[in-house]
């Protein structure tokens, strides 16, 4: 059974070597004096189909790339010049690890994790201050925003009542007499009949107290004047008779005067 497992292991190892280099990964842990140079074990190099060039690019997930010189021996591959700057940029500490993947273009894509296996944010988050293209895009966006604010016009504010009235207002369609005639002929309505007496009373019924016209007042004054003119001779005659006649004559004249007064009153009333 042990022989069978050994055969399987060798077969899997051979199949892995036949994979494309872009599908292969290896992990290095920062140990010893790694700040100035980094040694890559030969077992890692032997798994690659191609040779590692004398100068490579180490690129993190935030597209931050560093050029590193590679020295080769029979036993190992050493990252030398440029490596110290890479360590400083990403603050590599003892116990940190790096996952390498060779993409075949003299470039290794790397993922950096700390001592407890967490990916370092500085190797994944894009730093816009070091990317001129991102800075230009930010400046353009700021200028566009300021320009839009400068040209924007304030909208007039309306009161709540005006807004409600405006939103609920509906134009009323105008109908001509011709448009209304078919409707009236289609739905004739019976007109209520009124008696002549009710119509006359309704039309001529006074709405306030009756007042005598000025013409009637003037006419009544005109008719009353003859009554005064007739009574004046009678009064004068009565005074003369009272002075010259006896008591019986005065009675007779008084009766005559009264009868004349009654006649005048009757004429005025009629």
UniProtKB/Swiss-Prot annotation:
Transmembrane segments: none annotated. Pfam families: B3. It is found in: Nucleus. Gene3D superfamilies: DNA-binding pseudobarrel domain. InterPro entries: B3_DNA-bd, DNA-bd_pseudobarrel_sf, Plant_B3_domain. Residues 244-259 have a biased composition (Low complexity). The keyword tRNA processing does not apply. Keywords: DNA-binding, Nucleus, Transcription, Transcription regulation. Residues 143-159, 228-243 have a biased composition (Polar residues). GO terms for cellular component: nucleus. Its main location: nucleus. Residues 127-159, 227-259 are annotated as: Disordered. This is B3 domain-containing protein Os08g0324300.
């Amino acid at each position: 059974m042990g022989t069978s497992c050994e055969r399987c292991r060798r077969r899997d190892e051979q199949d892995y070597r036949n994979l494309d280099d872009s599908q292969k990964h290896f992990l290095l842990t920062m140990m010893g004096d790694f700040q100035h140079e980094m040694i890559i074990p030969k077992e890692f190099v032997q798994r690659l189909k191609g040779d590692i060039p004398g100068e490579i690019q180490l690129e993190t997930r935030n597209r931050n790339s560093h050029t590193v010189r590679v020295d080769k021996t029979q036993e190992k591959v050493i990252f030398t010049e440029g490596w110290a700057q890479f360590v400083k940029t990403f603050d590599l500490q003892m116990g940190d690890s790096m996952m390498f993947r060779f993409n075949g273009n003299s470039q290794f894509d790397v993922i950096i994790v700390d001592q407890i296996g967490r990916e370092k944010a500085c190797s994944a988050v894009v730093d816009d201050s070091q990317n001129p293209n991102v800075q230009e895009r930010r400046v353009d966006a700021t200028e566009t925003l300021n320009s839009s604010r400068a040209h924007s016009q304030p909208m007039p504010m309306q009161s709540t009542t005006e807004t409600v009235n405006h939103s609920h207002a509906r134009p009323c369609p105008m109908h001509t007499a011709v448009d209304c005639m078919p409707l009236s002929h289609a739905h004739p309505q019976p007109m209520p009949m009124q008696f002549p007496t009710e119509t006359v009373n309704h039309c001529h019924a006074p709405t306030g107290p009756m007042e005598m016209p000025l013409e009637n007042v003037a006419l009544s004054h005109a008719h009353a004047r003859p009554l005064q003119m007739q009574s004046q001779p009678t009064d004068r005659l009565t005074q003369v008779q009272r002075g010259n006649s006896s008591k019986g004559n005065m009675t007779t004249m008084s009766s005559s005067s009264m009868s004349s007064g009654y006649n005048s009153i009757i004429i005025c009333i009629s």
